[in-house]
C-alpha cells in the first residue's frame, strides 16, 4: 500500500521541478478537477441493457470475453458504476442508452420516455453526478437491411424518428432534474456491405429524418445533441451513410456538436488533428475516447501516444471548455469495473500531463521560429515527474494511489460480482 508521506515528499520535489519551468502544479490539478468524463454504462453489462437483454447485438458491435460477474439488473449495474466512480478522482457523468430504461412494463424502443429513466435520475442525484444520453439504433428487429433513419421504407424511418424524439425528451429530463447539461449522442449503423448505385438518396433521407427529430427546440442548458460518424462498420464496409464529412457538415449547418470517436477513423489517421480544423466553424465537440487496434475494436483506453496526442491538442488549443469527453470501449476479458477505472484514470493522466507544460512559453518560441527550443523542451517534458503530481491528485480526491485500487476491485468481485453467477446457476 502506498504511504501518504512518501506521496507528499515526491510531490514536493515534482512541484519544484515544474516551477523551474514556470508550471504551477496546483493550478494544473485544479484545472483537471473541472473536467468531467462521461463514463459509459454499457461496459458493465456488455451492452445487453434491460429492455430486451436477450436480443442479439447488432450494428457491427461485438463484445469479446466472458469474465465472471456481469451486471444483469439495474441495481447491479449502478452498484458497479458506484464502485468505479469511487476509484476515479473527481466528479463525473454517466452515459446511458435507450435500452437501459428501467420499467415494469413491456415497452418498445419508440415507447420509452422520461418516466422510464426515473430510476437513473434518482440514482444520479444520490451520486451527485450528471447523465448523458444515446438513442439506441441497433439490436432491434426494426433495423431493416442495415438501415434505420436513412431507410428507403417510410415506416422504418418513422419508427426510428420517434426513438430519436423520445431520447431528446429523456435527455431534457436529465438536464432539468440534475442541473447539468445532458449531451445526447446520435450514431446510426446505416450503410451497405457492397457497392451501392445511389449514394445520394440515403443521405438526403438521413438529413430529412434528423431534421424532423431535431425540429422541437429544447433549452441547451438542459440538453444538446451530438452527431457521430464512422469510416465503416462490420456489414457496411462499402458505404456508411453517416460518414465523417456528412456529420461534420450537418453539425456545422445545424448548430450541433460533432462527435469524434477515436476508433471510427482509418488506423493511420490522427484524430487529434481534427479538433482545430473543426472548432473555428463548429459549436463544439463530443469526444469518444477509445483504443482501436487495427480497426474499431474498442479496447480499454490506456495511457498511450494516441491518447496523449488527443489531450495535448485539447489543452494546448484551449478547447476543453467546448469539448465533452466520453469513454467508449467494452471488454469482457477483464473485470468490467476495472475496465472503467483503467480507462478513466488513463484519460485523466493524459490530461494532467498535457496541462503540466509551459504552453505559453512554447507558443512564444514557436512564433519566434525557435523550433530548437520547442523540440528540446517537449522532449524533456516526457521525463518530468508528472506521476508524482498524479498521485497527489488522487490523494487530494480521496481515491487510491497507484495500483492500490486493485485490492478494492479484488474484494468487490469476490463479495459482490462473482456470487451473481452462482445465483444464476442455482436458479
Swiss-Prot record:
Protein name stated in the entry: L-rhamnose isomerase
Catalytic activity: L-rhamnopyranose = L-rhamnulose
Enzyme Commission number(s) from the entry: 5.3.1.14
Keyword line: Cytoplasm, Isomerase, Manganese, Metal-binding, Rhamnose metabolism
Lineage of the organism: Bacteria, Bacillati, Bacillota, Bacilli, Lactobacillales
Record's keyword annotation contains Ribosomal protein: no
GO molecular function, a single term: manganese ion binding
The organism of origin for this protein: Lactiplantibacillus plantarum (strain ATCC BAA-793 / NCIMB 8826 / WCFS1)
HAMAP family: RhaA
Amino acid at each position: 500500500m502506498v504511504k501518504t508521506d512518501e506521496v507528499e515528499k515526491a510531490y514536493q520535489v515534482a512541484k519544484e521541478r515544474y516551477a523551474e519551468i514556470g508550471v504551477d502544479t496546483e493550478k494544473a490539478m485544479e484545472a483537471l478537477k473541472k473536467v468531467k468524463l462521461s463514463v459509459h454504462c454499457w461496459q458493465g453489462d456488455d451492452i445487453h441493457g434491460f429492455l430486451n437483454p436477450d436480443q442479439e447485438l447488432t450494428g457491427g458491435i461485438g463484445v469479446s470475453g466472458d469474465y465472471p460477474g456481469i451486471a444483469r439488473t439495474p441495481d447491479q449495474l449502478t452498484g458497479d458504476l458506484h464502485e468505479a466512480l469511487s476509484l476515479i478522482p473527481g466528479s463525473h457523468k454517466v452515459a446511458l442508452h435507450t435500452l437501459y430504461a428501467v420499467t415494469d412494463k413491456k415497452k418498445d424502443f419508440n415507447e420509452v420516455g422520461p418516466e422510464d429513466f426515473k430510476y437513473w435520475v434518482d440514482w444520479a442525484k444520490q451520486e451527485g453526478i450528471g447523465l448523458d444520453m444515446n438513442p439506441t439504433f441497433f439490436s432491434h428487429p426494426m433495423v431493416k437491411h442495415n438501415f434505420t433513419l436513412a431507410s428507403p421504407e417510410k415506416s422504418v424511418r418513422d419508427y426510428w424518428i420517434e426513438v430519436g424524439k423520445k431520447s431528446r425528451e429523456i435527455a431534457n429530463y436529465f438536464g432539468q432534474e440534475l442541473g447539468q447539461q445532458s449531451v445526447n449522442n446520435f450514431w446510426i449503423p446505416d450503410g451497405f456491405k457492397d457497392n451501392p448505385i445511389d449514394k445520394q438518396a440515403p443521405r438526403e433521407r438521413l438529413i430529412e429524418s434528423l431534421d424532423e427529430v431535431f425540429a422541437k427546440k429544447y433549452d441547451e442548458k438542459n440538453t444538446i445533441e451530438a452527431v457521430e460518424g464512422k469510416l465503416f462498420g462490420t456489414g457496411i464496409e462499402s458505404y456508411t451513410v453517416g460518414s465523417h464529412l456528412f456529420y461534420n457538415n450537418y453539425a456545422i449547418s445545424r448548430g450541433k456538436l460533432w462527435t469524434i470517436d477515436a476508433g471510427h477513423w482509418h488506423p493511420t489517421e490522427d484524430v487529434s488533428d481534427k479538433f482545430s480544423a473543426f472548432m473555428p466553424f463548429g459549436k463544439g465537440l463530443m469526444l469518444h475516447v477509445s483504443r482501436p487496434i487495427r480497426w474499431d475494436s474498442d479496447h480499454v483506453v490506456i495511457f498511450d501516444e494516441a491518447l496523449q496526442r488527443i489531450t495535448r491538442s485539447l489543452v494546448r488549443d484551449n478547447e476543453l471548455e467546448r469539448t465533452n469527453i466520453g469513454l467508449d470501449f467494452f471488454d469482457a476479458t477483464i473485470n468490467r469495473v476495472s475496465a472503467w477505472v483503467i480507462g478513466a484514470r488513463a484519460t485523466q493522466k493524459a490530461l494532467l500531463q498535457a496541462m503540466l507544460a509551459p504552453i505559453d512559453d512554447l507558443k512564444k518560441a514557436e512564433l519566434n521560429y525557435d523550433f530548437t527550443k520547442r523540440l528540446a523542451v517537449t522532449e524533456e517534458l516526457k521525463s518530468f515527474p508528472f506521476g508524482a503530481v498524479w498521485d497527489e491528485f488522487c490523494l487530494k480526491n480521496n481515491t487510491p494511489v497507484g495500483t492500490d485500487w486493485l485490492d478494492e476491485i479484488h474484494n468487490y468481485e469476490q463479495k459482490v460480482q462473482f456470487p451473481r453467477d452462482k445465483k444464476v446457476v442455482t436458479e
